[in-house]
Amino acid sequence: TDEEMLAIKENGGVMGISPWAPLIWKKEKGCRPDVKDYVDHVDYVVNLIGIDHVSFGADNTLDGNKDDKGTADQAVLYPAVVGAYNSCVGTRSDERHAKGFEGCWQLENVMDEMKRRGYSEEDIAKLTGKNLLRVLRANWN
């Protein structure tokens, strides 16, 4: 919720934004979300809590392995979020993340979209690790 995100900001934390498709899916669009939809989500959170409190939260494997069991588990664990998405888009594990950001190897697609929207190199550096490092260093003395 917005309140939870504001609490993260108030406590100096960082929120990782996931490309998990059911979270960023725009129902009216009727199709699997893409990189632009993901960056729309990033924009919303950055506008709410500020660039210093946002990071990428890829939530997928580095090697691109598909997790069909995890996909099935999601439908059971989060029926309100996943049910409508599955009905419209499908249940294949390769449809679980935004098109063009299926894994960390495609982070460049996200960075390119952010540059198109006017994010600076420093903003992108914060989102790709600088913010997380700041919080980890502050807490892992």
What are these regions (language model features)?
Residues 1-13, 36-53:
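Histidine/acidic residue-rich metal-binding segments in metalloenzymes
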Residues 14-28, 65:
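Active-site clefts of carbohydrate-active enzymes
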Residues 15, 59, 124:
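Conserved, mostly hydrophobic/aromatic
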Residues 18-19, 49-74, 78-100:
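Short acidic/histidine-rich active-site segments
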Residues 23, 61, 129:
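Positions that flank functional sites
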Residues 24-40:
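Active-site glycine- and acidic-residue-rich loops that bind
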Residues 30, 65-72, 136-141:
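Short glycine/threonine-rich loop-to-helix capping motif typified by GTGT followed
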Residues 92-141:
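Mid-to-C-terminal alpha-helical segments outside catalytic/metal-binding sites
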